[in-house]
Amino acid sequence: MAVPPLFFLLTLLSLPSLLISAGASNAYPSIPGTAPIDGGFTDELKPIRREVYGNGKIYDISHRYTPEMPSWDSSEGIGRFLWLAASMKNGSLANNSEMKIPTHTGTHVDSPGHVYDKYYDAGFDVDSLDLQVLNGLALLVDVPKDKNITAEVMKSLHIPKGVSRVLFRTLNTDRRLMFKKEFDTSYVGFMKDGAQWLVDNTDIKLVGIDYLSVAAYDDLIPSHLVFLKDRETILVEGLKLDGVKAGLYSVHCLPLRLVGAEGSPIRCILID
């Protein structure tokens, strides 16, 4: 039976809408330009925020950035650091945020240029840090809760030779200092003699700690100078170490490639 030309033409014209309908239901919530601007979602949207992934195999040991997170020598936290510079609600084609934060805020990394001006001028920035040091087997240890990390404390930890990455969990975690917006000078950190003992007597090249500085407030610059003098030790600060057992893990830390910056936010995870 011959198909009337008009019927054939109408069938061809209807194919695009049929394809769009199939695509919307099978592959995408909507095809751009064919659905309302809300995307056509009917279910209530609730983002899932995790600390642990893979049934306890992956631990996120980085802190979330919020206006209330502590900032160096501030009683008010970092404050507003993120804003929506372009908004779809105001007619923009997409949402685009901008941010402004100190590079040594939250979970972050120090480069040698942080305390050595000659290294800063020479270009020893976070882009020059060795990712091989920032990724690999790491030991999470608990530090005695009542003191800063001195040479005596380092000796008492009995960290074996050959261990190159150590995360030091201190009283800072128990006190939840990284969850308090007011900067606290009584945090636990390395004294100069503890830093020197580590450099002289261990193979540690990655030093991680659970507040904004690896160095105790009373030995702030001297301890940093010891750690960063040889440009081989990398400092990761502001780690979130609650809820993780002491022991051996695979650590993975990735700073931003900020050319010219002596510090950078860093995302760190532990894999069991």
Curated annotation (Swiss-Prot):
GO biological process: L-tryptophan catabolic process to kynurenine
Subcellular localization(s) per the UniProt record: Secreted, Extracellular space, Extracellular matrix
Signal peptide location: 1-24
Annotated Pfam families: Cyclase
Superkingdom assignment: Eukaryota
Outcome of gene disruption: No visible phenotype under normal growth conditions, but the double mutants cyclase1 and cyclase2 are embryonic lethal.
GO molecular-function term, one example from the UniProt record: arylformamidase activity
KW Acetylation (keyword) present: no
Protein's job: May function redundantly with CYCLASE1 for normal plant growth, development and viability.
Record protein name field: Cyclase-like protein 2
Organism for this UniProt entry: Arabidopsis thaliana (Mouse-ear cress)
